[in-house]
Amino acid sequence: MTTHVVCLDGTGQTRLQPNPTNIALIFNAMGGLIVDADNGSFESTLAVNGPVVQVGKYLPGVGTEGIPLFKLVEQTVGAGIAEQIVRGYTFLSRNYEPGDEIIIIGFSRGAAAARCLAGFVVGQGLLNPANYHPENKNAAYLRGIAAWYQYRAGQPWLARDSDLTDIFLKLGETVPQLTPADFVEVERILAVAVFDTVNSIGIPKPEPGGWLGYDFVIANTDLSPKVLNGFHALSADENRANFFPTYWTPRNNITQVIFPGSHSDVGGGYPEPDLSDRALEWMLPNLASHGLRFDLHNIRALAPNPTADGHDDGGSFPWCELPKKPREFPTTVFGGSPAFTVDSSIGERWGKPVNVLPANVRSDYEAIGLFAGGKPLYP
């Protein structure tokens, strides 16, 4: 039995950048034999006493390298998002065998893609390797696009107010028509683990008022019952309106924890990783308890510091020109049970004279509803 791990990074992020995100660090920690696949992606193979026990795929974020075949799809479902989803899907289709396990991990828009990929895999099934040549990448990508098209057509939450429906329908005429025999069922996914899923996905388009909106949203709020565990690390301090998080509807085995700092102070990528190291320190043992193999000797030492300076992800152009909206954390979402817990680092940070870089602004957790009277509002 092999565990297959797909790691989907955030916008503009790559594995080899000087300050890797938590997604790249998790992939690196998995160890094994790592090879440069193509177009910014990497694959890993971990064997123990002979048999392969874990394989991994790292995919860079939107706005990095890409495959020309996907350009029309990207114009339809958002730059790079479809490519991340389909490349993760074809990797799993190429390697998965019945009885194997799957873990999917993502950050930011890669988190939205991870959640969508999980629903795609358990909802549509993986490609049947008996009906095509998995090593022929172009053939695999075309079949992956066809499978994604078929799945997307049946998921109303994947397309809202899309002005591009006609383009997508035309795309459906250019890819193979797949039948149920072209798929193999996947009974379960062990875990989906995400850092700060953002809900604005798709093609930026003009909106009244002059700022960029998004054509549709792809991150579902319901985690499939075939996904056994969901882990979500959320930012308390991110304030960009179009980076508002997409929560999961509460159910058993979903854990959503709020951490201090901005979007990238949770998902990583800054030269000062003091805050993002805490979210990673929380995520790794959760994944390990559900099948992920990793060795911290494969990455730099983690040094979380809850009172370290944070960062203002929205302080530079073009984000500084777009609307701001403080995060909201309702005590329940969708009428369900308590949706969140507050990490202990929030309590350590609350009331301290900490700064947000580059602006000298204190974090105020009472203002966004995490604390009242000095006590956390969540378990």
What residues fall within each predicted segment?
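Active-site- or binding-pocket-proximal scaffold segments within functional domains
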Residues: 1-379
